């Protein structure tokens, strides 16, 4: 159960102002609504240079104050000649900072600087071969004919003054353009996606050769600075942390404990919807192996009671979230008082919701409402904490690196995503103690068989689902009428899209045989071969 909490917000993304030494060299991405904006930031960070995603509305003056080494304009779904198309502050062209426009960002650059963009005779979507006309500067070490990913219905029809074509495709005469003197560059393709074979080389050229950045954004340096900042902020005050056993909250707990030791209190609320043996193993690991005290709260009966008669998945989430808040409130009052709440806020949370609740006297962010992956409600108004969020600059893959760096074992670092409501939303229909036991046993077999064959890290998620129906079967000479189990095993890079995994038949056979023979109440196993989209990874 992921109980790491994040602020509920509704405003546009704002920059993280409290830059440390690591972020002095920064590449800013202005977001025009692209589904790939976060991916651009991740690709920049993979080059060991810090990056942030800001709204396209960010003023040139604000950007000047941030002093970026470079700016990237993201793609987007609009046409630059549309009346409602988003435009950036035209003064950014006078900042004297290298700028790279990607897809819509390139078209916007061309449009605002005196060129022309129009609807293309033929749109270009998917893979395309890039023919390089100028192999220097931005396209250094990018092979001629390399594959790049296109997704556009508009094209540049007239170049702005001072620009020249760097590359073209069979359908796009201006696939890459540049004004070398002003260090303004544009590409019609998406170098950030994995399908663009030469994309990373292009990004590295922009970051290192054009923006002249240095590789300062490293895991070791981040950990050192985060510990220093936590100590400076918290001082000798007490900090409360909600532990779930997932990689985010576990990494947070390790980092906080390294920084402040026994000033940290970890609370694990067992709501009864975790996988078999997980609660006991988690508490034992933290207390005996990691020597981090954990306050264990057994709330299984309370959560099971509120599930009686509930079949709607959203109602399940609402009730679980509400009850979690009640238990969390009671526990914090019993163990308190606390000055700070340690949150596992990650950078995507900051991008999606950048509103802040600020204490007018101290200027610090305070937790008035919290949000978890099971959509919990707000904390009571009189239960106010100041926030400490050492992971809020990180993407998920960076959290895993930090986890390894601070000593988190690989079994937690590589733990597959698990929904906040846990098994409650992998049981379709009403959640009962009997159904929970059936699903726990079946799910354990799935994980055991996958693990034994060294396949665990091959899949984004691998789990069992219990359906609220029964089917006829035969075992021995007896007719059976029992539940079916669904196997859901998928591959994905980020969970936004997913493909059903081509699991070897012998593995599927072993899982099926064990479940129907070892799990009482199950007589059939089926395999879900639906990708996302159109389906979702979870069934509820």
Swiss-Prot record:
The protein's Enzyme Commission number: 6.3.5.2
InterPro entries cross-referenced by the UniProt entry: Class_I_gatase-like (IPR029062), GATASE (IPR017926), GMP_synth_C (IPR001674), GMP_synth_GATase (IPR004739), GMP_synthase (IPR022955), GMPS_ATP_PPase_dom (IPR025777), NAD/GMP_synthase (IPR022310), Rossmann-like_a/b/a_fold (IPR014729)
HAMAP family registered for this protein in UniProt: GMP_synthase
Biochemical pathway: Purine metabolism; GMP biosynthesis; GMP from XMP (L-Gln route): step 1/1
Protein name per Swiss-Prot or TrEMBL: GMP synthase [glutamine-hydrolyzing]
NCBIfam families the UniProt entry points to: guaA_Cterm, guaA_Nterm, PRK00074.1
Function: Catalyzes the synthesis of GMP from XMP.
Binding residues for ATP: 244-250
Segments forming domain Glutamine amidotransferase type-1: 26-216
Molecular function as annotated in GO: ATP binding; GMP synthase activity
Catalysis performed (reactions): XMP + L-glutamine + ATP + H2O = GMP + L-glutamate + AMP + diphosphate + 2 H(+)
Domain of life: Bacteria
């Amino acid at each position: 159960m992921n109980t790491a909490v994040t602020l509920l917000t509704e405003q546009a993304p704002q920059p993280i102002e409290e830059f440390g030494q690591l972020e002095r060299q920064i590449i800013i991405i202005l977001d025009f609504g692209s589904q790939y904006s976060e991916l651009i930031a991740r690709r920049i960070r993979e080059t060991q240079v810090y990056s942030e995603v800001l709204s396209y509305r960010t003023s040139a003056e604000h950007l000047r104050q941030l002093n970026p080494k470079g700016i990237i304009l993201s793609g987007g779904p609009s046409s630059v000649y549309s009346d409602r198309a988003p435009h950036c502050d035209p003064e950014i062209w006078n900042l004297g900072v290298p700028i790279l426009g990607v897809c819509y960002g390139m078209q916007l650059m061309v449009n605002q600087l005196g060129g022309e963009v129009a609807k293309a005779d033929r749109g270009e979507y998917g893979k395309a071969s890039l023919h390089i006309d100028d192999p220097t500067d931005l396209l250094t070490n990018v092979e001629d004919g390399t594959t790049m990913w296109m997704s556009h219905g508009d094209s540049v029809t007239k170049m702005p003054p001072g620009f020249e074509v760097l590359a073209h495709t069979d359908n796009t005469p201006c696939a890459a353009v540049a004004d070398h003197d002003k260090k303004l560059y544009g590409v019609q393709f998406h170098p950030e996606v994995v399908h663009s074979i030469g994309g990373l080389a292009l990004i590295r050229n922009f970051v290192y050769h054009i923006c002249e950045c240095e590789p300062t954004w490293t895991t070791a340096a981040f950990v050192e600075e985060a510990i220093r900042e936590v100590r400076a902020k918290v001082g000798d005050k007490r900090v409360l942390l909600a532990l779930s056993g997932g990689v985010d909250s576990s990494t947070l707990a390790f980092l906080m404990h390294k920084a402040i030791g026994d000033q940290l209190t970890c609370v694990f609320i067992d709501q009864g919807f975790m996988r078999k043996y997980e609660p006991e193993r988690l508490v034992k690991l933290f207390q005996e192996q990691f020597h981090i005290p954990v306050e264990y709260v057994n709330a299984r009966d309370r959560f099971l009671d509120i599930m009686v008669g509930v079949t709607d998945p959203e109602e399940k989430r609402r009730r679980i979230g509400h009850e979690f808040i009640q238990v969390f409130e009671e526990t914090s009052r019993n163990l308190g008082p606390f000055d700070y709440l340690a949150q596992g806020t990650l950078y995507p949370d900051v991008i999606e919701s950048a509103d802040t609740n600020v204490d007018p006297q101290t200027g610090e962010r305070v937790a008035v409402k919290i949000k978890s992956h099971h959509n919990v409600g707000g904390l009571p108004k009189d239960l106010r904490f100041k926030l400490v969020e050492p992971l809020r600059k990180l993407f998920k893959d960076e959290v895993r690196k930090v986890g390894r760096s601070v000593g988190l074992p690989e079994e937690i670092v590589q733990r597959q995503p698990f929904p906040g409501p846990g098994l409650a939303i992998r049981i379709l229909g009403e959640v009962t103690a009997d159904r929970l036991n059936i699903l726990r046993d079946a799910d354990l077999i799935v994980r055991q068989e996958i693990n034994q064959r060294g396949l665990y890290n091959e899949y984004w998620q691998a789990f069992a689902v219990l359906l609220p129906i029964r089917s006829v079967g035969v075992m021995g000479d007896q007719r059976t009428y029992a539940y079916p189990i669904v196997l859901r095993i998928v591959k994905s890079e980020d969970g936004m899209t997913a493909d059903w995994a081509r699991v070897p038949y012998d593995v599927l056979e072993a899982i099926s045989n064990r479940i129907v023979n070892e799990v009482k109440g199950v007589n059939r196993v089926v395999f879900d071969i639906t990708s996302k989209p159109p389906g979702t990874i979870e069934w509820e």
